[in-house]
From Swiss-Prot:
Annotated protein name in UniProt: D-alanine--D-alanine ligase
Gene3D superfamilies xref list: 3.40.50.20, ATP-grasp fold, A domain, ATP-grasp fold, B domain
Binding annotation for Mg(2+) 1: 306, 319
GO cellular component: cytosol
E.C. designation(s): 6.3.2.4
Cofactor binding note of this UniProt entry: Binds 2 magnesium or manganese ions per subunit.
Keywords: ATP-binding, Cell shape, Cell wall biogenesis/degradation, Cytoplasm, Ligase, Magnesium, Manganese, Metal-binding, Nucleotide-binding, Peptidoglycan synthesis
Pathway involvement of the protein, from the record: Cell wall biogenesis; peptidoglycan biosynthesis
Native organism: Listeria monocytogenes serovar 1/2a (strain ATCC BAA-679 / EGD-e)
Lineage of source species: Bacteria, Bacillati, Bacillota, Bacilli, Bacillales
Chain's gene name: ddl
Length: 370
């Protein structure tokens, strides 16, 4: 019997359109001999709309933008529901057929543990990270504490609460200027995109950046700016994760001068070099830190680890992303493609990992014996 793969995409997020592109890519990469593709679209307003079961490839992304005016019928477990009709999240519940949810959502309500909690309550297997890893990695302050506890090197940073900023602004600025040197980067603690992030090169810019960041969160992290290469690595697995080859993001206008790479991908003004050239000892450190971060978060399925590597070979883990970009041209799938795992096979592996984790969870005891 085919596995029913529920694709959950859209959402109340600044990355709504990216999520649609991701769903389009995943659906068109699915082996429909193995999977039954069941799309569920979450509108910008947060309404859940169930689409038709898909029997072939899509031609346009817009085919996934369902609305309440659609009238095509879709057979469900014991009744029929109109495609385009608003539904309850309970539609995710398995109906006897092997079912897995693939959440293709980004940012708040998508990769912060909230929708993952829904899947846990429904006891349905789902691709990617659980509640703990998702929520901890979304919060930059909590994430940094976990990495520090694991002994993973990070750039210096200062965490600031809004109430402290309001009451002790001068003292907070003095503390930051004592610990950090300009330039610094000011980031809301709990946003998954670049919204609210600013670079500050002096005190006035720092104050302005803090004011901007506090519009989006009541907690802010201020990080030391470094001149470094940006190198990323994919991690895949559950209890025994493995790492991909490293990839590098070249800044706008940079020219690739590397000898040893299999592929160079160009996206607007950003060049991706995969695999990139890294000293073998540094590469082993990078793998070690990526796996330590993965296990420290109790991650599962997939994680992308983002590093800084300075000219004098100082290595810093900047952050991890528990739901990285997932179109065929995004860094994470490209890293695995160049490691030997193509896009379609990567999707199938993630579904298998979801099933494995769910089976392990259900094998646990949840009540005391009489």
């Amino acid at each position: 019997m085919k596995t029913k793969l529920i694709l959950l995409y859209g959402g109340k997020s600044a990355e709504h359109e990216v999520s649609l592109q991701t769903a389009f890519s995943v659906i068109n990469a699915l082996d429909l001999e193995k999977f039954e593709a069941a799309p569920i679209y979450i509108t910008n307003e947060g309404e859940w709309i169930q689409g038709p079961l898909l029997s072939g490839k899509l031609d346009f992304v817009e085919q996934l933008r369902f609305s309440a005016t659609d009238t095509i019928k879709l057979a469900t477990t014991e009744s029929e529901k109109s495609e385009g009709e608003a539904i309850s999240p309970a539609v995710l519940e398995a109906d006897g057929q092997e079912t897995v949810v693939f959440p293709l959502l980004h940012g708040p309500n998508g990769e912060d543990g909230t929708v993952q909690g829904l899947f846990e309550v429904l006891n349905i297997p789902y691709v990617g990270n659980g509640v703990l890893a998702s929520s901890a990695a979304m919060d930059k302050i909590v994430m940094k504490k976990i990495f520090a506890d694991a002994g993973i090197p990070q750039v210096p940073a200062v965490a600031v609460r809004l109430i402290d900023w309001k009451n002790y602004q001068e003292e907070m600025v003095a503390e930051m200027e004592e610990v950090l040197t300009y330039p610094v980067f000011v980031k809301p603690a709990n946003l998954g995109s670049s919204v609210g992030i600013s670079k500050a090169t002096n005190k006035k810019e720092l104050v302005d950046a803090m004011t901007e960041a506090f519009l989006y969160d009541r907690r802010v992290v201020v990080e030391q700016g470094v001149v470094a290469r940006e190198i990323e690595m994919g991690v895949l697995g559950n209890d025994t994760p493995v790492c991909s080859v490293p990839g590098e993001i070249l800044p706008e206008g940079a020219v690739a001068t590397f000898y040893d790479y299999k592929a160079k991908y160009q996206d607007n003004n950003t060049a991706l070099i995969i695999p990139t050239e890294v000293d073998p000892e540094i590469l082993e450190q990078m793998k070690e830190y990526a796996i330590q971060a993965f296990l420290g978060l109790d991650a599962s399925g997939l994680v992308r680890a983002d590093f800084f590597l300075t000219e004098d070979n100082q290595l810093f883990l900047n952050e991890v992303n528990t739901m990285p970009g997932f179109t065929p041209y995004s860094m994470y799938p490209l890293l695995w493609q160049e490691t030997g795992l193509p896009y379609g096979a990567l999707i199938e592996r993630l579904v298998d990992l979801a099933k494995e984790r769910h089976a392990a969870k259900n094998a646990l005891k949840y009540k005391l014996e009489d």
